[in-house]
Amino acid sequence: MNIDPSTAPKEVKEDLKNLQTFLSQTLPAKKLDQNVLICAWNIRMFGGLTMKWESQEEDSPKRDMHSLLCIVDILRRFDIIAVQEVRGNFKCLREAMRLLGPDWSFLMTDVTKGGKGNNERLAFIFDNRKVKLSGLACEIVIPDDELEKNKAINADALQRQFARTPYAVSFQVANHTFVLLTLHVLFGKKSADREAEIQAIADWIKGWAEEMNSWNHSMITLGDFNLERGNDPTLQAFLSTGLHIPPDLDPHARTIFKKSTTYYDQISWFKNNISLQYNGGGIVDFRGNVLQNRNHTLQELSFRISDHFPLWAEFLTP
């Protein structure tokens, strides 16, 4: 059974129409040969799907056909989306790709085994009408000698740092080639205890960005960095190599629940190693703009849409 939007109940169609109006008012338009819209979205437990227009209390998972159509309408507003929390069962992803249509493609990692991996994948979804693959797709392993430079780093540092293996893919838009590196960093309860490890990882990312730049490839990192705002030592370590987080992304909440000191999702790059021109970014605050007639709590909404907002950035590509 597949989702057929034409058979959706009237209230679902009206809800989707309202969402599309909101998205048009919130996001810049996708323009061929003029811009590229990049998004990082941690979609909570993006795996199974209940094939009903509205899931009930006894249903599992809670994400239903109406919810997935909302997610797809958001996805199609971007050119490239880095998605986190794609589960081992990726029925939602398969159905989303079918709904997006033949102009869209995706790449994803294998499931990361182990408790911290949480049976999840990382994925990139992209619009083939504007975006082309340019040859590179790899899971990242940071060399041991990068960690051994600092004796304060423990032998199991990488296992603790990455819940899922970082994933890098190169894309071409117009005359610009760039690498997107998506990762999920774990810092544990005391982020200051991992400062040396984060410094080593930041140093390695900078070196790789410089290497990419020597081939006229820009590199953008995006994903769940799990950082603290302000003067937190891990944030300072990560930024110490020149990694740039756009100031206009700073004030935006990253999750639907509340503003906090955490800096979960990020889009960042090295200013000297990028050929794209940043033109602004933000979040898609879908609260109140999806599933409007259901009166869900935020917790209930998080299992149907997500607990994270889509974080986006527009780059000009003239």
Model-inferred region functions:
Residues 1-104, 108-121, 198, 289-292, ...:
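N-terminal, active-site-proximal structural segment of metallo-dependent hydrolase catalytic domains
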Residues 66-76, 172, 197-214:
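Short, basic/hydrophobic alpha-helical segments
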Residues 49, 90-93, 115-118, 189-192, ...:
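Extracytoplasmic/secreted cell-surface and envelope-processing proteins
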Residues 82-174:
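Structured beta-strand-rich core segments of catalytic domains in phosphoester-bond hydrolases
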Residues 35-48, 135, 177-187:
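Active-site-proximal beta-strand elements of phosphoester/diester hydrolases
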Residues 52, 85, 173-200:
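Metal-dependent phosphoester/phosphodiester hydrolase catalytic core
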Residues 44, 87, 184-186, 225-228:
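Catalytic metal-binding/acid-base residues of hydrolase active sites
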Residues 1-25, 90, 206-220, 227-318:
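Metal-dependent phosphoester-hydrolase catalytic domains
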